[in-house]
Amino acid sequence: MIYQLHEFHKTVMAPAVVWADTTRHFFTNPLSPLAYTPVSRTISANSEMFVRLLRRYPKPEWGIDEVISNGERVTVTREIAIDKPFCQLLHFRKSLDVAQPKLLIVAPLSGHYATLLRDTVRTALVDHDVWITDWADAKMVPLAAGPFHLDDYVDYICEFIRALSPQLNVMSVCQPTVPVLGAVSLMASQNDPAVPKAMIMMGGPIDTRRNPTSVNDFAAGRPHSWFSDRVIMRVPGNYPGFMRKVYPGFLQHASFLAMNPDRHMNAHRQFYNHLIRGDGDSADAHRNFYDEYNAVLDMPAEYYLDTIKVVFQEFQLPKGNWSVRGSLVRPETIRKTALFTIEGELDDISGNGQTEAAQTLARNIPAEKRKHLLAKGLGHYGIFSGRKFRETVYPQIRNFIRLMSQREADLKLVRMR
């Protein structure tokens, strides 16, 4: 019923949103006489605040049309490499003939769209041939497509890795560190020749017993039935996924805001002041950030509940009792894949040590194929986007991939001799 009420509220308020947006245009358009009245900025600012509070936020565009790569400006086209019911594997193809290391970026399925990693993709495209998982909004997936469990997520990752191998590097950001480690572990235990060359794991909940955050405490402090009873809802009839059980994006968005309410209130207060002062650049920066932040998707209920149980309540991966399709996940079987774990010193979602735990679990990876980075002064989002990511974190990722490629090439030369 809550989902239906949410949709009813959005629908009822839609005319008011249109009216407020029209008012904003009248008082900001340079061709309108109303834009030059003493109260124009105040009226337009209040109108925009109203619109942004009540409007729907669609999935943002990628907006990556060109990059500088190999010293030249090249165009970028986005192609669907693999189309699955719950995910599209996207390839950012560059008009460049030079072969570059292949990089699969596994985006989180945790409420936001994969476009949250736009800066990650744009930065990586300079030196790599990039693919990314673009997870579907569950309310848009027909019920006939069936359920989607955490095991299905792992299956998807295995399929994508096999499709892009050999010589593939995999980067997982936050939530997918667990299923990616699970996928690579299963492939390694089966002696699958398609195992990736390197894994880069960033800010993920491998072992949430280490330095638990408020997010971890919230998940661990309630019985599993609390989540299935309180936050799982059926999709309303105005979406293709009608009757599918989901964890709604608007609930996840509310939890995001509740983590740092003062920060978000201050950001919106400053945005209002920017509008009043006519500070267009600062206002645009706010719009760009919150257009992305406010765009959320629904998660399949099965996957969400599996993740709560496996990752946050029973700690099955670090305890060594996580099974996927009846096969035990054994990270100690990984030997050929290099591992680079990255954490943010100020991360308030995945605490320090939670991602580094992968180094302990995958204990048979040779020392020369390991690296860990604690990024000083960076929070959760700072380790994969922003200026400091581009200047301090990404160069180490690029160099790690290059080093592993060079060592593999050197080893092949030695064997040939």
Could you tell me what each predicted segment is?
Residues M1-A45, S165-P166, A183-E302:
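Alpha/beta-hydrolase-fold enzymes
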Residues E61-I68, E72-V141:
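Short, surface-exposed "cap/lid" segments of acyl-processing enzymes
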Residues M140-P142, D152-N169, L181-S185:
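Conserved acidic catalytic loop of the alpha/beta-hydrolase fold
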Residues M171-T177, G344:
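Conserved alpha/beta-hydrolase "nucleophile elbow" surrounding the catalytic nucleophile
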Residues F312-P331:
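Active-site nucleophile elbow and catalytic-triad environment of alpha/beta-hydrolase enzymes
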Residues I334-R335, F340-E343, D347:
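Short beta-strand/loop motif that positions the catalytic acidic residue
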Residues D348-Q354:
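Conserved alpha/beta-hydrolase "acid-adjacent" motif
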Residues K376-E391:
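Catalytic histidine-centered segment of alpha/beta-hydrolase-like enzymes
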